[in-house]
Amino acid sequence: RLPEDEFAEHLKGMTKTTNRGIPIYIYANSGTPQIVTPLQSTTQANIKKFGQGMEIGNDIRLYELTNDAFQTLRSQYMNINIRPGSATLAIGVVVDGYLIGVYAFSAAPSVAQWDKHIETPTVYLLSDFPVEPVDYKHLAKLVLYAALSKESKRIAERITKRRAASLVTTAFSKNPESMKYRGLFKVLNRKHNDSLEKADWAKDIDPANAYYMQPYEINYGAPMGQWTLQEGLAIWKKKHSQKR
């Protein structure tokens, strides 16, 4: 829909063919306004969640999630403005039997060429998020340590049926760098849209596109398999286990 839509009074519907698809606006002289979007299948994950007042223990494991369970957790904990993508496999990060976060791989073909920036082949990190609320400031980084672990690398190689050398992902940010990935991932490239930095967010940006309409689009990459899950947990405890 255009900001200055001369047919706005005749807008009767909006639909999407996929969750990530562009909106299709329908105009008519009559009829009841409707919105039609794809239905997302969800189910509760049968696992306890980490929470406030709890301490991170020492037994860290990976737990493969069903797609429906992943959809539920993503809807519960992730930014609502991030459009759902299709995950090849979603993985829960569990410490002492409690879910502390989730990440997901996509094995879909990509036209991106990262061989000049990082070792290939690569696997795409579609999604990563911690559970909330918690007392730890940087629990999101523990999810990333798990995603980059030797155990995670083996899972990535199993689902892609090829070697997985590096993990790549994309962040949209108001700043030149995302603090979540800083220190673990390196910047592969960065796109800057100066017009978005100057945009009036109260009227120029559609809330449905808010997450993606940031001044910076940053592609990140990091080698996989540099530590085991236990080693990654130990590093996180040493560097990032500060509380709020």
List the predicted regions and their residue ranges:
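Nucleic-acid-interacting cores, centered on viral/eukaryotic replication and modification enzymes
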Residues: 24, 61-65, 98-101
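Short amphipathic alpha-helix that is part of the acyltransferase structural core
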Residues: 42-83
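Acyl-donor binding region in acyl/amide transferases
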Residues: 3, 87-88, 107-224
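Conserved beta-hairpin
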Residues: 87-107
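Acyltransferase donor/substrate-recognition loop-hinge adjacent to the catalytic core
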Residues: 36-57, 209, 213-216, 223-239
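A short acidic (Asp/Glu
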Residues: 6-11, 73, 102-104, 177-184
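Residue-level detector of beta-propeller blades
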Residues: 11-16, 99, 187, 192
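Class I S-adenosyl-L-methionine-dependent methyltransferase catalytic core
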Residues: 1-51
